[in-house]
Amino acid sequence: ILMWDIYNEPGQFGTGDKAFKLLQYTWDWAYEIRPSQPLTACLDGAIGKEILNLNGENSDVITFHTYEAEKLEPTIERLKEFGRPLLCTEYMAREFGTTFEFSLPIFKKENVGCYNWGFVAGKSQTHFGWSTILELQEKKKKGEFINEGDELPEPDEWFHDVYRIDGSPFKESEIKFIKELLGS
């Protein structure tokens, strides 16, 4: 176990600071058992000033989510102020510019850890963008584009994942880039 992310995106979905009390309890419970691994709850990805402050004060490692390319470097600069290790736990969104080619050199330069949320296109369907599934389901309801029982077609631009279910890469150029960056 690398670390415990005790509460993903507190304050999201309109709960804002209403989630603050539950987050306080969550931090109390986590510190009561105090595992040997670091504790964290994301800062960028959480919503509400009190929530952000609480997570910043209590996280051993500062974790964050940044999907928009133009926000990545400013977010890293802002979070460096905590003086703790940084780990980006959600970032890969090709349609928003946070591709491997864009993001990984920044993480490397800034000494920020990261991991890719999706790997193989499968049951979770994270190769589809946030709006793709809803759009396709609407077309399906109208009898357009897709029939009951048909597989959803592969999107032109994937969101998270790297490999197809058969093991072939979505973009061979990404695999080559990652190998070159890692020196393998």
What label would you give each PLM region?
Residues 7:
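Carbohydrate-associated surface elements
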Residues 2, 11-184:
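Substrate-binding clefts and catalytic carboxylate motifs of secreted carbohydrate-active enzymes
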